[in-house]
């Protein structure tokens, strides 16, 4: 299996890691105290194998949100943190009006962020996501922001309510937030990964956005993650995926620690790395 998504459930002191397989269903691993304590196979609502790339996962309330084509699949969170479950069936779908590569949920604001992955030639994004920022950057992806408290109610999907859009650079694999920063992870192949830090208070920088962006049928404010407001850049090991911010550290999941990329098992790529944030 090839690791992708990364989440932490503090109530259970458990990390969740999503992974896809070359042949077979996608899976979620539960990791506690440095050890894998369970492996759960993902299933569609009809009982067939769920074979998404599972590039991102995040939990909120009773559900784990997993990236899929066109939106997010919902799975009961209890299936992954309680003993006895070997399979988990999808319990709903949230349309995010994009093909999400990652997902992040801010527990403080109850906002859900889901963005696309761009790489020229093989991972193209829609023309609407190619945006020249006020600072002159040529951004190539967009992060859609939703008020998750209005987007769903248990298993009953209500109308998705987008509230904002963030123009972002290419190669983004994951996102998290610290007390003062929005942090994006970017990576491709064996090149070094990077963590990009931007101010969290974008609404203050762009208090009256000059442009809006259409998500579904809704026009929302458009903000920019661009070099003119970049706080800092941190180099990280190759193949960085999703991020978790915990106890003052950004934890980085690495795709290299898999059978597909054997070098990660033979080198230090098999570890989750932590970057201490000083704000």
Predicted regions: what is each one?
Residues 26-34, 77-81, 88, 127-151, ...:
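Beta-propeller blade signature
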Residues 4-5, 56, 102-104, 174, ...:
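Conserved beta-strand position repeated once per blade in WD40 beta-propeller domains
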Residues 18-22, 69-71, 77, 116-119, ...:
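Short loop/turn segments immediately following the C-termini of beta-strands
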Residues 41-49, 92-96, 163-168, 231-235:
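Surface loop/turn motifs at the tips and blade-to-blade linkers of beta-strand repeat domains
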Residues 11-13, 61-62, 108-110, 179-181, ...:
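Short coil/turn segments that connect the beta-strands within blades of beta-propeller domains
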Residues 2-5, 27-29, 34-62:
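Blade-loop segments of beta-propeller domains
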Residues 165-233, 239-241:
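Loop/turn-rich, solvent-exposed surfaces of beta-rich toroidal or solenoidal domains
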Residues 1-26:
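Beta-strand-rich domains and repeat architectures in extracellular enzymes and scaffolds
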């Amino acid at each position: 299996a090839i690791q992708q998504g990364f989440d932490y459930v503090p109530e259970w002191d458990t990390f969740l890691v999503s992974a896809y397989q070359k042949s077979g269903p996608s899976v979620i691993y539960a990791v506690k105290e440095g050890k894998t304590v369970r492996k759960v196979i993902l299933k569609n609502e009809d009982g067939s194998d769920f074979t998404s790339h599972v590039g991102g996962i995040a939990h909120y309330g009773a559900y784990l949100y997993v990236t899929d084509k066109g939106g997010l699949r919902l799975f009961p969170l209890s299936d992954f943190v309680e003993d006895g479950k070997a399979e988990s069936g999808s319990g709903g779908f949230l349309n995010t009006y994009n093909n999400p590569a990652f997902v992040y949920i801010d527990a403080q604001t109850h906002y859900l962020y889901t963005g696309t992955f761009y790489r020229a030639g093989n991972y193209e994004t829609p023309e609407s996501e190619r945006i020249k920022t006020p600072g002159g950057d040529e951004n190539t992806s967009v992060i859609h922001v939703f008020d998750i408290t209005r987007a769903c109610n248990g298993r009953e999907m209500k109308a998705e309510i987008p509230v904002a859009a963030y123009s972002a650079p290419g190669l983004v694999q994951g996102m998290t937030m610290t007390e003062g920063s929005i942090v994006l992870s970017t990576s491709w192949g064996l090149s070094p990964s990077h963590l990009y830090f931007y101010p969290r208070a974008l609404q203050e920088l762009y208090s009256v956005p000059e442009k809006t962006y259409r998500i579904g049928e809704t026009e929302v404010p458009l903000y920019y993650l661009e070099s003119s407001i970049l706080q800092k850049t941190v180099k990280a090991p190759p193949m960085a995926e999703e991020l978790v911010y915990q106890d003052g550290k950004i934890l980085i999941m690495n795709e290299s620690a898999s059978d597909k990329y054997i070098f990660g098992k033979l080198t230090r790529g098999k570890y989750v790395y932590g970057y201490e944030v000083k704000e």
